[in-house]
Design a protein with these regions (language model features):
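Non-catalytic linker/capping segments at the edges of enzyme domains
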Residues: 1-44
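HotDog/MaoC-like acyl-thioester-processing domains
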Residues: 2-8, 97-101, 105, 111-149
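A generic structural signal for short beta-strands and their flanking turns/coil linkers
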Residues: 29, 39-41, 60, 85-91, ...
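Short, charged/polar surface micro-motifs in flexible loops or helix N-caps
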Residues: 38, 48-52, 69-72
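Conserved GNAT-family N-acetyltransferase fold
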Residues: 45, 67, 91, 122, ...
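A short interface-forming secondary-structure element
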Residues: 47-56, 63
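Active-site helix/loop of acyl-thioester processing domains in fatty-acid/polyketide metabolism
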Residues: 61-81
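Hydrophobic beta-strand-centered segment that forms part of the acyl-chain substrate-binding groove
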Residues: 74-105, 110
Length: 149
């Protein structure tokens, strides 16, 4: 599973997350992987009234969770089990407009995967809308190549 030339499927990455990081599904805002390709990962956060903040919009922490999850899924898709030890070192998110009361969609793109770092960009949308509601950039620390198997 850790062969970097082979990209994992949605099912394979979902199984890795379920087996090694099940707490991501606890609490508010259930997330899932919709599509996993070499150049883009699409993740979804199902609409959940518990993540709606005063004013009727999705909370910032919920949008951050989805963006971070999408990048992690993209890294797992690229690195396989070797990516399990990857950790967020930085994420900057700009909230651009109010999301609709619907599922949130994240489109993550790995801009660079190096020896020690992965850099990604994420755009968040309300389901059914082309308007970007948030934009994030993220840096992940990767395990040393010797530990990647």
């Amino acid at each position: 599973m850790s062969n970097p030339s082979r990209h994992l499927s949605v099912d394979e990455v979902s199984q890795l997350v379920e087996a090694h990081f099940p707490q991501v599904q606890e609490g508010n805002g259930r997330v899932s992987i919709e599509r996993l390709e070499a150049d883009e990962t699409v993740a979804r956060m199902a609409h959940d009234d518990r993540v709606i903040r005063p004013g009727g919009t999705v909370s910032g922490p919920a949008m951050f969770k989805l963006a971070d999850f999408a990048v992690y899924a993209a890294i797992l898709g690229r690195l396989g089990t070797a990516g399990l030890q990857a950790v967020t070192t930085n994420m900057t998110i700009n909230f651009l407009s109010r999301p609709q009361p619907a599922d949130l969609i994240a489109r993550a793109r790995l801009m660079k995967v190096g020896r020690r770092l992965a850099i990604a960009e994420v755009k968040l949308y309300s389901q059914g809308s082309a308007q970007i509601v948030a934009h994030a950039t993220s840096t992940y620390a990767l395990p040393p190549p010797a530990l990647r198997g």
